[in-house]
């Protein structure tokens, strides 16, 4: 879908010009596993097939001949994406310690980041070809789990509890996005998960 779908869309334009093309991508294009910070200029050498497809889609967008911007979202969470929170409360998440770094963005901030950049383009402002959209605090997964356990009663981890998230350990820098003037409603996991915990347990 990332490659074929975009190519089909561009073909359907039949030579019509776009004011600006936005491609929704993912930080899965980064394969770093050494706790390092990554930004829009960092190496993209995804080992997983899904990350390779996303990166190929990015290239189609950038080389489309239209003004284009790629937005690389980290893990999206929120009221409609609360599996992780439910797993911690139910004892189905028990990461190693220290765990790999994790990166996330609340679904409201994700939607607003895309809308904000679109508005910037419509206002005639020059956009960069790539932006990382991730909140302001990369954090080790076990720290997030411990914090949730401190906020609400959680079941003891089960023997088959998951030990972690996806492979890799990197810290995604959102400096370029912040430089546009964008502000996060949920700048870290605490701000985002606290109301979700209240809704789940209230």
Regions found by a protein language model. Give the residues of each.
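Catalytic helix-loop patch of NAD(P)-dependent Rossmann-fold dehydrogenases
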Residues: 34-70, 97
């Amino acid at each position: 879908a990332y490659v074929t779908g975009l190519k089909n869309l561009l073909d359907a334009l039949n030579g019509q010009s776009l004011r600006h093309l936005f491609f929704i991508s993912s930080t899965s294009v980064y394969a770093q596993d050494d706790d390092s910070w990554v930004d829009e200029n960092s190496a993209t050498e995804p080992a997983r097939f899904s990350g390779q497809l996303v990166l190929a889609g990015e290239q189609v967008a950038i080389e489309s001949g239209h003004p284009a911007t790629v937005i690389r979202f980290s893990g999206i969470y929120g009221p409609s994406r609360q599996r992780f929170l439910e797993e911690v409360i139910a004892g189905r998440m028990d990461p190693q310690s220290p765990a790999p770094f994790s990166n996330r963005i609340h679904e409201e901030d994700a939607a607003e980041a895309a809308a904000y950049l679109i508005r910037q383009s419509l206002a005639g402002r020059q956009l960069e070809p790539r932006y990382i959209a991730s909140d302001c605090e990369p954090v080790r997964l076990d720290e997030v789990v411990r914090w949730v356990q401190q906020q609400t009663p959680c079941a003891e981890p089960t023997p088959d509890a998951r030990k972690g998230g996806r492979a890799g350990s990197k810290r995604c820098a959102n400096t370029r996005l912040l430089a546009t003037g964008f502000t996060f409603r949920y700048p870290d996991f605490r701000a985002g998960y606290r109301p979700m915990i209240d809704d789940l347990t209230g």
